[in-house]
Structures are given as structure tokens and as C-alpha cells.
């Protein structure tokens, strides 16, 4: 084998985490190789996950606004509308992202290589190129950012035509009249609310009594209520016995304690698993955990100190924002540059309809720690902006310590929740008191007024 090409840093995977790691290394003046097995840059986030689903979501919201604005007219989607029509902006969005990122990589002198990469030893990478050739590379530091793929259980025959996963869902040609979704996590709930708003009859099934078990229960109850108002159905506490295509027109889902559910299409949304089967981890002295991830420390170092793992490789929460920060931290630590303290408050945003967001402690967590925290609530119907926008069905919760002095957390369900949460994030990072929200003036009319209303509710003013 020829002499390996030497780099300072090799990054495997060009998703959000890998991009940030590579750029951070290059900005420090180091030789960086970024290896990506797909043709495009951005990973599943750009091509099969975040960007496509949010583009479809925006189309659903725009259509809903058209319906509301033209209430006097009989506005309906054509029964045979194609998914591609609803995603007509997606190609432009992806193209703009790809152009921008390619320019960024070139400007920073990063070597972008396409192929499948695996370890030969703890410092050497063997890459199979797209034309079948092989190339070996070596580096002082290696950052693994290979992302994840849908976790499809063996007892559900995903065929990507009738029974789909989140990677193949948007490859459907036509908007289905009915859709069953198995899994009440983030992906399942986001797609359930989007397709329900588009007029599809959606049945969301989960083992838990309520979806999104990690979220504030009051917010989830609010979401489920609005989902069902859109025509959706939630079946909680269910055990799926069998999923099969009947060979004619329906996917049949057999439940243990309920009648079978029939639908044109079915989405399996039971989480994701890290992509590591091609990496030959054993050659580098690495072993995956029982959950199929890699264990890392606060600097994203694995058990082999010069090998780092970031993003979906290290498990939940599967947030692009978290992954990008991990990529940055890993690269800086590998180069002995100041890393800074890890962010203690990472906002969680869920792009359901309506949106949900959380930062800090929710009510349940605060009760475990403080026993009697104070809770302030602001209903969106109390602010003029929500009424103007026709989005009065929302709620902001503010959690404070028992004295009503210190802010502990903020949870929001409703329009612009994923933007609003950053006010709470900034306040938490600065150690703001509840009085802070009362003493400050917010623009009128805005959704941000809900912070002041919730603070007043805590203090009984």
C-alpha cells in the first residue's frame, strides 16, 4: 500500500457536526480532510431529515393560512396532489445550502473527499473511493461524525413503498389519504401534525400513555388536543403485534388491545441508530456501548484520546445545534485550543404544529429538586400578537424557585415557540430573576409579552 496522505485532522462525516469540526480545524491553520460517503454535503439533516421535513411543514402552514384567509371560499387540496408539489422549494433550499457549504470548505482549504472510510489502525484511515479505488490517510486527530439512520425493528417489514421510515417517507409520490405512524417521539409527532394539517387521516401509535415523554406533560397535552382537533388520532399505551401490507390497498397494523388500524401508508418512527458499521472500530481499539453509541467525555474524546466522536454518534439528544457545538469543541480540544465551558442550557425545539420548546427545568424536574416551585403561565390568547396572527392556542410556562426569585426554566407550546425559547435561554445564562421580566418592557404586539405575563403570574401581580 502507498504511503498514507498525512493531515492534522481527519473528520469522517460532512453533516452539521463534521462541517463545524472541519472548519474549526482549518481556521486554526491546520490541514484538514473531510470524508463524506454521499455526493452532497450536509448528511441526513439536509437531504432526508431536518431540512425536507421543515420545508414540508412550512408548506402545510402556508396552505392553512390560505384556508383561514379565504374562509368564504371552498379551498381544498386536489385529491391527487403530489408530495413534490408541496416540496417545490426544497431543491432550491438544498442547492443554496450546498453552494454555501462548498464555498466555505474551499475558502478554508479543506480537502473534501468522497468515499467510505474505516480504520486500519488507530491513526490510519482506509477510504474506498466512489470509483472503487482505495486511499489511505493518517492524522494526529480523528473526529467521527458519521450521523445516524432510522432504527427499523426486525418485526416490521419496511419496504420503503407502503411501509416507510423517515428517510423514505418523503419519496412518496402522492399525499396519502391515511397514514399510521408508529412511535411518539420527535420525528413521529412532527410528521403526524404536518400530515394532519394537510388533510391526511393520521393515527399516531405509541407504547406510552402520551407521546414525547421527556417533555412537560402540560405542553404535550396541549399538543395532543390540537392534533386531534386537526383530525388526528393518538393511540397511547399500545403494543404493536404485527404490521403487514395486505397486497391490495392498505397497511394493516394489528394491536394487542385494539381493533386493527388500516391506512394507505405507514411510517416507522422508532428512533435512530448511529452509523458505525463501516468504521472498523476494533482496529482503532474502540467498542460501541450497548446502545450502539460511543462513550465520550466532556470534550467528546473516546477511550482512545486522539479519536473524538460527535453528534448522533454519542446519542441523545439528537439536535443539530448540539452536534455543531460538539464538533467545534472536539476540534479545538484536539488542537490544544481553549474550549470553554460546555453549555449547561441547550434549548430543545420540536417542530410540531404547534411548535414546542423547552430550556432549563420543567415543572416535574423542579418539583423533584425544590418540592414547591412556583409556576407562572401565560396563555397566547392573552396577547394581541397571537390574536392578530390567529394563533391564540398556545402557552408559555415559567418555572421559578419556591421564593419566586430565581428563574429555573421555560416551556412553550405555540406559534414561534422555537424562537421565543431563546429569551429564556439568555435569561437563564445570566442568572436572571423573575423581577427581570417585570422590570423590562417588551414590544407590543409581540409573543415575547408572554414572558412578562408569566412573571406577573408567579408573583401574583
Regions found by a protein language model. Name each.
Residues 159-176, 260-333:
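FAD-site-proximal beta/loop scaffold in flavoenzymes
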Residues 10-12, 117, 136-147, 182, ...:
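Short hydrophobic core segments
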Residues 10-38, 51, 55-62, 335, ...:
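Flexible, glycine-rich terminal cap/loop adjacent to redox cofactors
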Residues 2-7, 24-30, 36-177, 208-212, ...:
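Glycine-rich flavin
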Residues 29, 199-201, 231, 431:
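Glycine-centered short loops/turns at secondary-structure junctions
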Residues 13-16, 39, 182-185, 312:
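Glycine-rich Rossmann-fold phosphate-binding loop(s) that bind the pyrophosphate
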Residues 17-24, 163, 188-191, 197, ...:
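Short glycine/serine/threonine-rich phosphate/pyrophosphate-binding segments
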Residues 50, 146-201, 205, 234, ...:
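Glycine-rich dinucleotide-binding loop and its adjacent helix/turn
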Amino acid at each position: 500500500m502507498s504511503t498514507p496522505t498525512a493531515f492534522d485532522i481527519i473528520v469522517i462525516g460532512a453533516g452539521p457536526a463534521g462541517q463545524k469540526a472541519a472548519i474549526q480545524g482549518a481556521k486554526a491553520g491546520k490541514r484538514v480532510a473531510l470524508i463524506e460517503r454521499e455526493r452532497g454535503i450536509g448528511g441526513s439533516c439536509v437531504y432526508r431529515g431536518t431540512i425536507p421535513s421543515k420545508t414540508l411543514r412550512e408548506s402545510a402552514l402556508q396552505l392553512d393560512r390560505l384556508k383561514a384567509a379565504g374562509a368564504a371560499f371552498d379551498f381544498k387540496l386536489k385529491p391527487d396532489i403530489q408530495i413534490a408539489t408541496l416540496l417545490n422549494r426544497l431543491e432550491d433550499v438544498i442547492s443554496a445550502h450546498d453552494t454555501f457549504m462548498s464555498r466555505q470548505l474551499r475558502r478554508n482549504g479543506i480537502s473534501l473527499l468522497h468515499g467510505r472510510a474505516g480504520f486500519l489502525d488507530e491513526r490510519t484511515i482506509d477510504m474506498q473511493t466512489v470509483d472503487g479505488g482505495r486511499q489511505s490517510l493518517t492524522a494526529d486527530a480523528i473526529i467521527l461524525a458519521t450521523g445516524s439512520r432510522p432504527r427499523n425493528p426486525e418485526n416490521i417489514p419496511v419496504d420503503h413503498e407502503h411501509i416507510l421510515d423517515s428517510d423514505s417517507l418523503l419519496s412518496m409520490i402522492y399525499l396519502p389519504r391515511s397514514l399510521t405512524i408508529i412511535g411518539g417521539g420527535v420525528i413521529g409527532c412532527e410528521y403526524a401534525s404536518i400530515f394532519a394539517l394537510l388533510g391526511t387521516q393520521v393515527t399516531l401509535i405509541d407504547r406510552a400513555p402520551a407521546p414525547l415523554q421527556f417533555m412537560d406533560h402540560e405542553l404535550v397535552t396541549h399538543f395532543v388536543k390540537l392534533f386531534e382537533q386537526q383530525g388526528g388520532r393518538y393511540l397511547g399505551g399500545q403494543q404493536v403485534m404485527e404490521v403487514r401490507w395486505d397486497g391490495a390497498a392498505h397497511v394493516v397494523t394489528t394491536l394487542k388491545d385494539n381493533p386493527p388500524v388500516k391506512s394507505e401508508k405507514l411510517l416507522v418512527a422508532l428512533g435512530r441508530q448511529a452509523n458505525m458499521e463501516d468504521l472498523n472500530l476494533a482496529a482503532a481499539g474502540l467498542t460501541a456501548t450497548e446502545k450502539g453509541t460511543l462513550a465520550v467525555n466532556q470534550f467528546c474524546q473516546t477511550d482512545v484520546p486522539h479519536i473524538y466522536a460527535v453528534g448522533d454518534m454519542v446519542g441523545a439528544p439528537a439536535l443539530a445545534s448540539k452536534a455543531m457545538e460538539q464538533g467545534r469543541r472536539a476540534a479545538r480540544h484536539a488542537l490544544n485550543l481553549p474550549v470553554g465551558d460546555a453549555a449547561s442550557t441547550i434549548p430543545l425545539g420540536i417542530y410540531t404544529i404547534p411548535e414546542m420548546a423547552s430550556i432549563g427545568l420543567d415543572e416535574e424536574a423542579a418539583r423533584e429538586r425544590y418540592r414547591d416551585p412556583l409556576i407562572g403561565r401565560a396563555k397566547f390568547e392573552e396577547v394581541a400578537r397571537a390574536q392578530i396572527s390567529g394563533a391564540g392556542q398556545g402557552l408559555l410556562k415559567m418555572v421559578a424557585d419556591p421564593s419566586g426569585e430565581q428563574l429555573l426554566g421555560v416551556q412553550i407550546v405555540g406559534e414561534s415557540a422555537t424562537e421565543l425559547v431563546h429569551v429564556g435561554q439568555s435569561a437563564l445564562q445570566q442568572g436572571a430573576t423573575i423581577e427581570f421580566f417585570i422590570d423590562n418592557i417588551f414590544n407590543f404586539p409581540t409573543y415575547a409579552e408572554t414572558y412578562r405575563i408569566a412573571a406577573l403570574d408567579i408573583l401574583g401581580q
